[in-house]
Curated annotation (Swiss-Prot):
Keywords: Hypusine biosynthesis, Iron, Metal-binding, Monooxygenase, Oxidoreductase, Repeat. The gene is dohh-1. HEAT-like PBS-type repeats lie at residues 28-54, 59-85, 92-118, 178-204, 210-236, 243-269. Residues 143-159 have a biased composition (Polar residues). This is Deoxyhypusine hydroxylase. Residues 140-159 are annotated as: Disordered. It comes from Caenorhabditis elegans. Catalyzes the hydroxylation of the N(6)-(4-aminobutyl)-L-lysine intermediate produced by deoxyhypusine synthase/DHPS on a critical lysine of the eukaryotic translation initiation factor 5A/eIF-5A. This is the second step of the post-translational modification of that lysine into an unusual amino acid residue named hypusine. Hypusination is unique to mature eIF-5A factor and is essential for its function.
């Protein structure tokens, strides 16, 4: 793990400068970001925060995601500022709200309550779920760390009955918090049956936020069982770009020949965030098929 190593300020600054260098390919900037995330110190947080005025919504959303995964309270003012900035793209504001939920400091509850009423559904739904997570962590004294080295937006459900979880997942009458809990349980079960059930969430038309989270979780699983469903939503030009981009990255994580060929077809998509996602996903697929032990080299 990178975080176990000691880095000088100068070394951290070199990664930060690489992240903020707009002349570098996006895939190189992503690798610099992941190194800073794994280091996790305040200086890393500051470098990541400095990049949140970039032109790439994809990069900015990943910056906010990483700040949440680091769970460093030093990032809270930066994330609140991004959430409040209506000029930021919805996918970036959403990720800032989710990151505040991941850090789960009680001080963010008021701002999450405020933006749980935001007119943008991706933002309001995110803040409702994030507030639920902060309150759950407060009440239970536990975190929502997953077997996938990530901080989940909600805990997993208490049942392991795949059919029951599948029904909860696609029930639009239930709160998103409960459906997310079913989602993470299906992921953790990790059978072909649970993955197929999970993939059906990509067809739930009631929430783009929900579909994008399903795609993200399928990327964590890296199972070719879900390839067709991910392909369906990437190919759908009317789909929300948040969902299409997450489908692209999930296909990159699966990294087989079929997925790589799909990504190559969309590397020139009209939507910038989809184009860039395919570029990064192809880089990730190349890594998955290489002998490299670590994606973000130091």
């Amino acid at each position: 793990m990178v975080a176990s190593q000691k880095f000088s300020d100068a070394e951290i600054d070199s990664f930060g400068e690489a992240l903020n260098d707009t002349k570098k390919p996006l895939k190189a900037r992503f690798r610099a970001l992941f190194i800073l995330r794994n280091i996790g110190c305040d200086r890393s947080v500051d470098w990541i925060g400095k990049c949140l005025n970039d032109e790439s919504a994809l990069l900015k959303h990943e910056l906010a995601y990483c700040l949440g995964q680091m769970q460093n309270k030093h990032a809270i003012p930066t994330l609140v500022s991004v959430l409040e900035d209506e000029k930021q793209e919805p996918m970036v504001r959403h990720e800032a709200g989710e990151a505040l939920g991941a850090i789960a400091d009680p001080s963010v509850k008021d701002v999450l309550r405020k933006y749980a009423q935001d007119p943008c559904p991706e933002v309001s739904e995110t803040c409702q779920i994030a507030l639920g997570r902060v309150e759950w962590v407060e009440k239970s004294g536990k975190d929502t760390n997953s077997p996938y080295d990530s901080v989940d937006p909600t805990p997993s459900a208490s049942t392991s009955d795949v059919e029951e979880l599948a029904a909860t997942l696609i029930d639009a009458s239930l709160p998103l918090f409960d459906r997310y809990r079913a989602m993470f349980s299906l992921r953790n079960i990790k059978t072909d049956k649970s993955i197929k059930a999970l993939a059906q969430g990509l067809y739930c038309e009631d929430s783009a936020l929900f579909r994008h989270e399903v795609a993200y979780v399928l990327g964590q699983l890296q199972s070719p069982v879900a390839t067709q469903e991910l392909k369906d939503r990437l190919l759908l030009s009317t789909e929300n770009c948040m969902v299409r981009h997450e489908c692209a990255e999930a296909l990159g994580a699966i990294a087989n020949e079929e997925c790589t060929e799909i990504l190559k077809q969309y590397v020139n998509d009209e939507e910038r965030v989809v184009r860039e996602s395919c570029e990064v996903a192809l880089d990730m697929a190349e890594y998955e098929n290489s002998d490299d032990l670590q994606y973000a080299h130091v």
